[in-house]
Amino acid sequence: SNLEIINFLQRVGLDTYKDKPARLLSGGEQQRLSLARALLINPSLLLLDEPTTNLDPYSLNLIEEIILDENKKGKTIILTTHDMGQAKRLAKEILFFDKGKLLEQTKAINFFTKPKTKEAQSYINGKILL
Protein backbone atom coordinates (compact mmCIF):
# COMPACT_ATOMS: atom_id res chain seq x y z
CA SER A 1 0.00 0.00 0.00
CA ASN A 2 1.02 3.65 -0.35
CA LEU A 3 1.21 4.01 3.44
CA GLU A 4 3.67 1.11 3.68
CA ILE A 5 5.80 2.64 0.95
CA ILE A 6 5.86 6.02 2.71
CA ASN A 7 6.75 4.31 6.00
CA PHE A 8 9.71 2.55 4.38
CA LEU A 9 10.82 5.77 2.69
CA GLN A 10 10.66 7.50 6.10
CA ARG A 11 12.71 4.70 7.62
CA VAL A 12 15.52 5.30 5.15
CA GLY A 13 15.20 9.08 5.30
CA LEU A 14 13.71 9.54 1.82
CA ASP A 15 10.05 10.34 2.51
CA THR A 16 10.43 13.87 1.11
CA TYR A 17 11.72 12.34 -2.15
CA LYS A 18 8.67 10.16 -2.82
CA ASP A 19 7.93 11.86 -6.15
CA LYS A 20 11.56 12.16 -7.29
CA PRO A 21 12.77 9.70 -9.96
CA ALA A 22 15.36 7.23 -8.63
CA ARG A 23 17.83 8.24 -11.37
CA LEU A 24 18.02 11.73 -9.84
CA LEU A 25 19.02 10.46 -6.40
CA SER A 26 22.61 10.54 -5.15
CA GLY A 27 24.52 7.28 -4.70
CA GLY A 28 23.77 7.17 -0.98
CA GLU A 29 20.11 7.91 -1.57
CA GLN A 30 19.94 5.16 -4.20
CA GLN A 31 21.50 2.69 -1.74
CA ARG A 32 18.93 3.61 0.90
CA LEU A 33 16.12 3.31 -1.66
CA SER A 34 17.38 -0.15 -2.68
CA LEU A 35 17.30 -1.28 0.94
CA ALA A 36 13.76 0.11 1.39
CA ARG A 37 12.61 -1.76 -1.73
CA ALA A 38 14.15 -5.00 -0.46
CA LEU A 39 12.56 -4.64 2.98
CA LEU A 40 9.13 -3.73 1.58
CA ILE A 41 8.47 -7.34 0.56
CA ASN A 42 9.47 -8.52 4.07
CA PRO A 43 11.88 -11.30 3.06
CA SER A 44 12.98 -13.84 5.67
CA LEU A 45 16.52 -13.64 4.27
CA LEU A 46 18.32 -10.47 3.22
CA LEU A 47 21.47 -10.71 1.07
CA LEU A 48 23.53 -7.51 1.14
CA ASP A 49 26.69 -7.15 -0.95
CA GLU A 50 28.79 -4.21 0.28
CA PRO A 51 25.66 -2.14 1.08
CA THR A 52 27.60 0.82 2.46
CA THR A 53 30.51 1.09 0.03
CA ASN A 54 31.31 4.72 -0.88
CA LEU A 55 28.51 6.14 1.26
CA ASP A 56 28.45 9.36 3.21
CA PRO A 57 28.54 8.92 7.02
CA TYR A 58 24.80 9.66 7.40
CA SER A 59 23.76 7.00 4.88
CA LEU A 60 26.28 4.49 6.24
CA ASN A 61 25.04 4.88 9.82
CA LEU A 62 21.40 4.76 8.78
CA ILE A 63 21.85 1.56 6.77
CA GLU A 64 23.82 -0.08 9.60
CA GLU A 65 21.06 0.85 12.09
CA ILE A 66 18.43 -0.67 9.80
CA ILE A 67 20.50 -3.86 9.38
CA LEU A 68 20.83 -4.22 13.17
CA ASP A 69 17.12 -3.49 13.67
CA GLU A 70 16.05 -6.06 11.07
CA ASN A 71 18.33 -8.65 12.63
CA LYS A 72 16.83 -7.98 16.08
CA LYS A 73 13.41 -8.61 14.53
CA GLY A 74 14.61 -12.09 13.58
CA LYS A 75 15.56 -11.53 9.95
CA THR A 76 18.55 -13.53 8.71
CA ILE A 77 21.06 -11.25 7.02
CA ILE A 78 24.05 -12.31 4.96
CA LEU A 79 26.38 -9.35 4.52
CA THR A 80 29.45 -9.24 2.31
CA THR A 81 32.00 -6.67 3.45
CA HIS A 82 35.72 -5.95 3.36
CA ASP A 83 35.31 -3.45 6.20
CA MET A 84 36.46 -5.13 9.41
CA GLY A 85 34.98 -2.33 11.53
CA GLN A 86 31.60 -2.92 9.95
CA ALA A 87 31.93 -6.67 10.42
CA LYS A 88 32.67 -6.08 14.12
CA ARG A 89 29.67 -3.79 14.51
CA LEU A 90 27.15 -5.93 12.65
CA ALA A 91 28.13 -9.60 12.59
CA LYS A 92 27.22 -12.39 14.95
CA GLU A 93 29.10 -14.93 12.86
CA ILE A 94 31.93 -14.53 10.36
CA LEU A 95 32.71 -16.60 7.31
CA PHE A 96 36.17 -15.53 6.16
CA PHE A 97 37.12 -16.25 2.56
CA ASP A 98 40.49 -15.78 0.90
CA LYS A 99 40.90 -16.30 -2.85
CA GLY A 100 37.46 -17.91 -2.98
CA LYS A 101 38.22 -20.48 -0.28
CA LEU A 102 36.45 -20.57 3.08
CA LEU A 103 39.19 -20.40 5.72
CA GLU A 104 37.18 -19.69 8.88
CA GLN A 105 33.61 -19.89 10.11
CA THR A 106 33.16 -18.78 13.70
CA LYS A 107 31.40 -16.39 16.04
CA ALA A 108 32.44 -12.80 15.36
CA ILE A 109 33.98 -12.33 18.81
CA ASN A 110 36.20 -15.38 18.29
CA PHE A 111 37.22 -14.24 14.83
CA PHE A 112 38.44 -10.89 16.09
CA THR A 113 40.06 -12.13 19.31
CA LYS A 114 41.43 -15.52 18.23
CA PRO A 115 41.62 -15.88 14.45
CA LYS A 116 42.62 -19.41 13.44
CA THR A 117 44.54 -18.62 10.26
CA LYS A 118 47.43 -16.33 9.46
CA GLU A 119 45.39 -14.94 6.54
CA ALA A 120 42.58 -13.86 8.86
CA GLN A 121 45.03 -12.42 11.40
CA SER A 122 46.76 -10.48 8.64
CA TYR A 123 43.48 -9.16 7.22
CA ILE A 124 42.25 -8.05 10.64
CA ASN A 125 45.54 -6.23 11.24
CA GLY A 126 45.56 -4.70 7.75
CA LYS A 127 48.78 -6.41 6.67
CA ILE A 128 49.47 -7.84 3.24
CA LEU A 129 50.76 -11.40 3.00
CA LEU A 130 53.15 -12.15 0.17
Q: Where do the PLM segments sit?
A:
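H-loop/switch region of ABC-family ATPase nucleotide-binding domains
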Residues: 81-82
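Conserved ABC ATPase signature
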Residues: 21-25, 29
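Catalytic Walker B motif of ABC-type/P-loop ATPase nucleotide-binding domains
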Residues: 46-49
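Conserved ABC ATPase "signature" region
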Residues: 2-17
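A short, surface-exposed alpha-helical micro-motif characterized by mixed small hydrophobic
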Residues: 87-89
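Conserved catalytic motifs of ABC-family nucleotide-binding domains
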Residues: 42
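Hydrophobic anchor residue at the start of the ABC signature
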Residues: 35
